[in-house]
Design a protein with these regions (language model features):
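Alpha-helical adaptor scaffolds
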Residues: 58-125, 130
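N-terminal leader/linker segments that initiate helical-solenoid repeat arrays
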Residues: 17-66
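TPR/TPR-like (Sel1-like) alpha-helical repeat modules
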Residues: 27-37, 140-175
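Sec-dependent N-terminal signal peptides
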Residues: 4-13
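Boundary/linker segments of alpha-helical solenoid repeat arrays
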Residues: 39-42, 56, 129-130, 159-171, ...
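Register position in tetratricopeptide repeats
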Residues: 54, 73, 107, 141-142, ...
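A conserved position within tetratricopeptide repeats
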Residues: 33-34, 49-52, 88, 122, ...
Length: 181
């Protein structure tokens, strides 16, 4: 019995250390991203995406997420949703699993489901500039243009050199001007 308790304690302590280590790395990268407005920002962005897409403690979940991503690339969207949903059931605290499923919901036109998953992503990782950009796209589809602009501006606050956010803000502002004429 004592060995079982020690094993369980070791598992939880190790799991916490891996998750904590990943969070520290993300904090450093986000500080760099915010202060660096150069070509290096794309390298920092890539490192952040790699950390987000790697489960901190369970390699099998990372493999499942990769499998779902490949299904998306092959346009097998319903199966991808099933894979991402399974990952979410196993670890509902992994923001990137929610983000992947939100992306697929957006791709199939399920904008409200996509928004619901994006809300969960941002609850778990408020700095998720990808989810904020996705939220902008969802709000454009729902014709909530002011909300879309807010989402992109939040993304720009986190990632100042995010060009796609800058482009989308301008396009939405132009769209709003056209509608008021």
């Amino acid at each position: 019995m004592k060995k079982v308790v020690i094993t369980i304690l070791f598992f939880f302590q190790t799991t916490f250390l891996y998750a904590s280590d990943q969070e520290k790395k993300l904090n450093l990268l986000f500080n760099e991203l915010k202060s660096d407005i150069s070509t290096k920002s794309s390298e920092i962005e890539e490192k952040i995406w790699t950390l987000w897409s790697t489960h901190p403690t369970n390699k099998n979940l990372t493999l499942m997420l990769d499998k779902g991503t490949k299904l998306v690339q092959n346009q097998n969207l319903n199966k991808a949703i099933m894979v991402f949903t399974e990952v979410i059931k196993i670890d509902p605290s992994w923001a990137e699993a929610w983000n992947k499923r939100a992306t697929v919901y957006y791709m199939i036109g399920e904008y409200k489901k996509s928004q619901k998953d994006i809300d969960k992503v941002l609850e778990l990782e408020e700095r998720h500039f990808g989810a904020l950009a996705g939220q902008g796209l969802v709000n454009i589809q729902l014709k909530n243009y002011e909300k879309a602009i807010k989402s992109y501006k939040k993304a720009k606050d986190i990632y100042p050199s995010m060009q796609s956010a800058e482009i989308m803000i301008k396009k939405i502002e132009d769209l709003i001007k056209e509608q008021t004429i």
